[in-house]
Structure formats: structure tokens, C-alpha cells
Amino acid sequence: MLRFLNQCSRGRGAWLLMAFTALALEMVALWFQHVMLLKPCVLCIYERCALFGVMGAGLVGAIAPKTPLRYVAMVIWIYSAWRGLQLAYEHTMIQLHPSPFMTCDFMARFPDWLPLGKWLPQVFVASGDCAERQWSFLTLEMPQWLLGIFAAYLVVAIAVVIAQAFKPKKRDLFGR
């Protein structure tokens, strides 16, 4: 299996699949926001940014998957999945154990050189409360689903990094 993961990491298909899954999750988030009229909170916006990081890692890995650039993509992937996992956990704890002392910010804070809230306010402006439970599916709230999604991204990323030590088998058609 590790050889297979190594082989997949050297092809564009797996990287593009990862970018596509993150894009699909972003589209679902925008559907919830603009069609179902759910208000995203600050942690939702940060989790959305972590998903953009996973998508960016997929695109970076797809550029040149047979070169060392894929290691840069793996670092971005692991960092984004880890930060997303942390944010989803914090968001889940705020929802499961609401407290007036543990709240999220009123607006998302982005660096001055990357004012996403000004560039794309439809995507990056928060208007909801982190403790409010707006949506659930199969008894899980949205941050709990994101906890599982980011955990899956992180587990697969770690497996792919470990798989880099196992060289893929060379396919020899005639067995020489």
C-alpha cells in the first residue's frame, strides 16, 4: 500500500483529486452560506481558509509531481490539515460546551498584505456566532464533520509522507 501511495504521489491525478475534493467542500460551504442562508462565523471562515490551503497543496503537487516540488505540496498539505483540525476542534468545543468566556472574534483577522475580507467579502466575511448550532446531519454539527474531514486529510498526508521512503516498483513487461 505504501508503494502505491508513493506511486500516486508521483502522478497528477491524486493531487488533482485532492484539490477537487477541497474545491467541492468549498462549494458546499458557499451553498450553505448563499442558498441556505446560514451565517458563517469567524472559525468557519478560518476553516474555509484551511480548506483553501489543502486545495492549494493539491494544485502545487499537480504542477510537477515527479520533482521535489511535491515535498513542498506535502508540507502545505500537512500544515493546512493540521490547522484545520485544530480550528474544527476548537469550534466543536465552543458548540458543545458554550460559555460566555469562550467566544470567537467578531470579524476574521487577515494579514495586511492579504485582506481577503475586502477582496472577496462574499466568501471571507463572518456574520454568525460560533456557538450557534445552525445545521446538523446524522446528529453531527458542521464543525464535527469538518473535524473528521481534516483528520482524514491529515492521516492520508502522513501516510503519503511515510510512503516516500518506499520506492515504487518498476513495471517490467517481460520480467527482465
Swiss-Prot record:
GO terms of biological process kind: protein folding
MF (Gene Ontology): electron transfer activity; protein-disulfide reductase activity
Taxonomic superkingdom: Bacteria
Family, as annotated: Belongs to the DsbB family.
SUPFAM superfamilies: DsbB-like
NCBIfam families for the chain: PRK01749.1
Residues passing through the membrane, by range: 15-31, 50-65, 72-89, 145-163
Keyword Ubl conjugation: no
Gene transcribed to yield this protein: dsbB
Cytoplasmic compartment residues: 1-14, 66-71, 164-176
Cysteine disulfide links: C41-C44, C104-C130
GO cellular component: plasma membrane
Matching PANTHER family: DISULFIDE BOND FORMATION PROTEIN B
Keyword terms: Cell inner membrane, Cell membrane, Chaperone, Disulfide bond, Electron transport, Membrane, Oxidoreductase, Redox-active center, Transmembrane, Transmembrane helix, Transport
InterPro entries: DiS_bond_form_DsbB/BdbC, Disulphide_bond_form_DsbB, DsbB, DsbB-like_sf
Subcellular location: Cell inner membrane
Periplasmic side: 32-49, 90-144
This protein's name: Disulfide bond formation protein B
Membrane-topology annotation of the record: Multi-pass membrane protein
Function: Required for disulfide bond formation in some periplasmic proteins such as PhoA or OmpA. Acts by oxidizing the DsbA protein.
Pfam families attached to this UniProt entry: DsbB
Species in which this protein is naturally found: Salmonella typhimurium (strain LT2 / SGSC1412 / ATCC 700720)
